Amino acid sequence: MINGTLDLHTFHPSDVKALVPDYLIECKKIGIYDVRIIHGKGTGVLRGIVHSVLSELSYVAHFQLAGESEGAWGATLVTLKRIASP
């Protein structure tokens, strides 16, 4: 189910490079432009992969670590670019 939150705890790091872009594209399709990606605090491996992937996606307007109430450095908040209306 696509609800704007992607929890990566159950995924292997090698899956994340394909999973994150696919999930974000599906979010855009249904009008979700603010997404939370939960990568966990741990050693930072998943966070690094997620941030690397996000920095390469042209449809990502902005991303940052979440605030304390949203998962702190265990989650990243992503804002997707909106499609301009003609």
Feature annotation, model-predicted:
Residues 1-86:
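Long, charged, low-complexity intrinsically disordered regions
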